[in-house]
Amino acid sequence: MSDAIRAVILGIIEGVTEFLPVSSTGHLLLAERFFHLGEGAFWDSFTVLIQLGAILAIVGLYFKKLWDVVIGFFTGDTYSRRFVIGVLVAFLPAVVVGLVAGKYIKSVLFNPWVVCFTLIVGGAILLWVDKLDLKPREHDATRFPLLMYLYIGIAQCVAMIPGVSRSGASIVAAMLLGADKRAAAEFSFFLAIPTMIGAFAYDFYKNRSEMTMDHMGIVAIGFVVSFITAVIVVKTFLTYVTRHGFVVFAWWRVIVGTLGLIALALGR
């Protein structure tokens, strides 16, 4: 398989799974394990670098809202300032846990057995939460209480375990704390911006020696594909979950995790 085709496939996987509650990291790890996509130091970095394409999809889709927040922050708007502070408060737990336990998590937990197990468990939790008779109190992701932002950020830390899903953890936490489905999903998108930019910057600096001009074309392909795919997925996802909830994504997780465990048990 050529590097260009590999970059397209990984870009599609990243763009489709990054903002769905199914774990992009888990799917990329399983793609590497079972289909031999992305093996080697460069491809490990590639899967992080193309996340920037998915991030820019969110920035593009929510540009007006984000721009209004930026303007409001600098002109003294109370809600804009509280939202910016809220995103930072939600982001900080991931920074702390990443610095303290990041190396341990990567060395011990980044394996397909863990991914398959957490996909199944996460799917069961998503099914449970989706069936709860919750009474949403928060309908605007930019106006959650500050403590709610903090609790969502703490929940997001669990997603450092591959297969859990960053968006899944933050969505479940937000819903249990009183957000409606759309607001929970939207805040997971907003929280992704600093979280993924931080991961991108750290990984790029750490593995800068792996990046050469020869690789830039391949990275560009994955970047563009992940951007386009993420735009399509995010627009469809919000409409879908507002009407139908998260059941289909829960079963997606359970099926992929179960098939993965069977394949691993058979020595694949």
From Swiss-Prot:
It is an enzyme of class 3 (hydrolase). The chain crosses the membrane at residues 8-28, 41-61, 83-103, 108-128, 144-164, 184-204, 218-238, 246-266. Its EC number is 3.6.1.27. GO terms for molecular function: undecaprenyl-diphosphatase activity. Belongs to the UppP family. One of its GO terms (biological process) is cell wall organization. One of its GO terms (cellular component) is plasma membrane. The keyword Oxidoreductase does not apply. Bacitracin is thought to be involved in the inhibition of peptidoglycan synthesis by sequestering undecaprenyl diphosphate, thereby reducing the pool of lipid carrier available. It is a multi-pass membrane protein. It catalyses: di-trans,octa-cis-undecaprenyl diphosphate + H2O = di-trans,octa-cis-undecaprenyl phosphate + phosphate + H(+). It is found in: Cell inner membrane. This is Undecaprenyl-diphosphatase. Catalyzes the dephosphorylation of undecaprenyl diphosphate (UPP). Confers resistance to bacitracin. It comes from the Bacteria. Keywords: Antibiotic resistance, Cell inner membrane, Cell membrane, Cell shape, Cell wall biogenesis/degradation, Hydrolase, Membrane, Peptidoglycan synthesis, Transmembrane, Transmembrane helix.
